[in-house]
Structures are given as structure tokens and as C-alpha cells.
From Swiss-Prot:
Any Gene Ontology biological process: translation
Ranges of biased composition (kind: Gly residues): 21-31
Protein name: Large ribosomal subunit protein uL15
Subunit comment: Part of the 50S ribosomal subunit.
Parts forming coiled coils: none
Family: Belongs to the universal ribosomal protein uL15 family.
GO cellular component: cytosolic large ribosomal subunit
Chain's role: Binds to the 23S rRNA.
UniProt keyword annotation of Transferase present: no
Keywords, comma-separated and alphabetical: Ribonucleoprotein, Ribosomal protein, RNA-binding, rRNA-binding
Pfam families with a match to the protein in the record: Ribosomal_L27A
Gene Ontology MF: a single term: rRNA binding
Region (Disordered): 1-60
Length: 144
């Protein structure tokens, strides 16, 4: 066997049907497009969601909800991430400096995920009840 003699197994590659090559081909004349109408024409397509003039689904359904402008700048931090930080005072600036939160973050919430093994002081961050209990159990404190 040589690289220049490689070829697919017999019958594994079926050649595609050619369009518009006579009645006997099965795809002659109209070439699988049917008779008349927009989609039979060259360049004729209908936009996604078009239902033939009937009110389309995306217009029948009501609008609801909105995108929170605060959510874009809010982040969550796990206790395990705080534990890995070298500083004793945890605030927004310390988290940004350690690249734990995005530089654009304006609000950070500490959540109970992982463990904290040392005493830290959390300043100016939102903290869940479970996370607050875990921080206090480790000898730390939470300040507003």
C-alpha cells in the first residue's frame, strides 16, 4: 500500500445526483424545486420565521422580562477563592488586584462554596448567610 494508491472502498462514496440532466436522472427539468412559486426561482428564499403572511410565532408571543443593567457588573466569589488570597482584608480592590473578579465589576457577592480555613475580614461586599457563618466560624468577620 502506498500513499498515491489510497482510495475509498468500492461503493462507500456515492456521487451526488446532478440537477437538470434529463427526465431519467430523477432530477431533470425543475431540478427538485417543484413548479412555480418564490422558492422555485433563482435567488428566491423566504426569511426565517416567515409563515406565509400568517402572524409569525415570534410576533404572536408576548414580550416579557428585561436585561438587568446591574447584572452586567455583578459577580460571585467562592469562599475557596477568598481562602487562596494572601491578604487578610478582602474588599473589591483586593479581588480586582488578584484577578478573581473582572476589572469592571461594581458589586461582588461572597457565596458558600468550598471551605475557608483562616480568619479574614470582608469589607464592602455582599455575603450570603451561609458564607457569613463560615467566615465567622473560621474566626473572621464581615463588615459593611
Amino acid at each position: 500500500m502506498k500513499m498515491n494508491t489510497l482510495k475509498p472502498a468500492e461503493g462507500s462514496k456515492q456521487s451526488p445526483k446532478r440537477l437538470g440532466r434529463g427526465i431519467g436522472s430523477g432530477l431533470g427539468k425543475t431540478g427538485g424545486r417543484g413548479h412555480k412559486g418564490q422558492t422555485s426561482r433563482s435567488g428566491g428564499t423566504i426569511r426565517p420565521g416567515f409563515e406565509g403572511g400568517q402572524q409569525p410565532l415570534q410576533r404572536r408571543l408576548p414580550k416579557f422580562g428585561f436585561t438587568s443593567r446591574v447584572g452586567r457588573f455583578s459577580e460571585e466569589v467562592r469562599l475557596s477563592e477568598i481562602d487562596s488570597l494572601g491578604t487578610d482584608i478582602i474588599d473589591l480592590a483586593a479581588l480586582k488586584a488578584a484577578n478573581i473578579v473582572d476589572q469592571q465589576a461594581k458589586q461582588v457577592k461572597v457565596i458558600l462554596s468550598g471551605e475557608i480555613t483562616r480568619a479574614v475580614t470582608v469589607k464592602g461586599l455582599k455575603v450570603t448567610k451561609g458564607a457569613q457563618e463560615a467566615i465567622q466560624a473560621a474566626g473572621g468577620k464581615v463588615e459593611e
